[in-house]
Amino acid sequence: MVGLLGKKVGMSQLFDAEGQQIPVTVIEVGPCFVTAVRTKEKDGYVAAQLGFDVVKEKKLTKARLGGLRKANLAALNLLKEIRTEDVSNLSVGSELRADNFEVGEFVDVRGISIGKGFQGVVKRLNYKGGASKGHGSMFGRVPGSIGAQAGGRGCRKKVRKGKGLPGQMGNEKVCVKSLKVMKVDAENNLLVLKGSVPGFEGRYLVVCSALKGGKKNPWKVRGGKQESPKEAPSEASKVETPQEGTKTSS
């Protein structure tokens, strides 16, 4: 799995070859820097800790700033760990950009949704409410009965856990799955996804390869160690071996 940290820029629209309008979201992903590498032997799991968004040093705690200075990195405001299968080509200080994703693949986006304050059950939980036509309603938008309150034989005089009631709406962790990558701007570190993502403009996001139907691409690193490509066999090393049942010239 490949993942990057980013920030929501805003929404726009694209048009396909048939002229159909496609709503898209623009996300600034990277440049991200590897601040730590977790291995199975040392930490018990495999992951890469990434840092994003350079800010002034006075905005960070001394503990975080000391760890970043030890790794010779700038003051990064956001640090997140991303579970992955292989970290062999990652090292502390490696730079990751938007070209880790390809056009046409699917990604999952995690973030915090927009808070909408204290809301009732009709808006928060899609309750139907009372009738709005005819003779009107006796209870309108109130939740109605929430359980037995008489306390008689066989009745529990309490509200069951999980009962839908009015309360805080939004401002919670949300994961939007399988969004298609429409465009990748590696120079400006921009990723264009089909559809919407949680949060308002400027909200931090985590973009990872989709768990369902996503590609398992290797990490593309800039400024870190990379695996050397395998050399193609030379013409001299290609020796034809006779197959069984064929005659060789003497």
Report each predicted region and the residues it spans.
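Extended basic (Lys/Arg/His-rich) segments that typically form rRNA-contacting surfaces
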Residues: 1-250
